[in-house]
Amino acid sequence: MNITAAQVNELRQMTGAGMMDCKKALVECNGDKEAAIDYLRKKGQKIAEKRADREAAEGAVISATTADHTYGAVIMLNCETDFVGSNADFVGAAKGFLQAAIDNKIKNLDALKAFTINGRTVNDLVTDLTAKTGEKVELKHLEVVEAPYVANYNHQGNRLATLVGFNKNFNGIEETAHEVAMHAAAMSPIAIDENDVPQETKDREMAVAIEKTKQEQAQKAVDVALKKAGINPAHVDSEDHINSNMAKGWITEAQAQQAREIREKVTADTLANIKEQMVMNIANGRVNKFFKENCLLDQASLLDGSMTVRQFIQKADKEATVVAFKRVQLG
């Protein structure tokens, strides 16, 4: 059957598939346009399966809120290359999926994938994008925040977006909320405050802080003992340095062995007799510093470093606070 260029172009406009793929589909389906569309869809599904082991690390991350700011969503639509990820059609598709979530206040990723747009599920439309772009395309994330007021921030380039939910709507909240959403994008907090940090993370940070404190106290004692023996601690702080400095003639083999013995004995003695309360005091200080650096409300405000984010919010309204936030980034 003779397939015309007009037929090929029409199918291409309808599906976004490549010219040669459209021509092949029409030939295989004897010019039947609807059958050719199904053929291309099936091909897209096969492409998706064939590319299942490919990494889809590029794409678009975009957020938005409802007009009343009580619901916000951020999606991540992934592909393989920045070229496709920055393509207007790809970004447009991502925005379309996001708008569906916003308009219908969709709660989770599975519900969004199953949602129908013009008779097609979002999951099918994502598969179509695989056929259209020739790359593995995945809808990986839908994060949602519902609160009395939700602010969003989209970083330039569609690679990073945030949502921040507040416990109340107050006069002038737009500017304050936007600044906090920008802060969350820039400073990468892991939790709202200390109470929001998972217990597993708290336990891990405390264990690290305790061990680090003990080792530092032992090292201080070792350094004092080495100096008393006439050995520069910097020359013997590792086996590599010991061997290197012996080769340079900076220390003798006897000094190297003496340093090893001092390190072993003083470390063991220090750890055996260390004051646990002192260790816990220092470790608690380190964990508190971790909270200040990683919890949104306790971080120094990006706009005014003289106050925390909590203080920045309460400057606008004493009763206002953050009740939820999401931060999604490519990579």
Annotated model-derived regions:
Residues 2-331:
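N-terminal assembly/interaction segments in proteins that build large macromolecular machines
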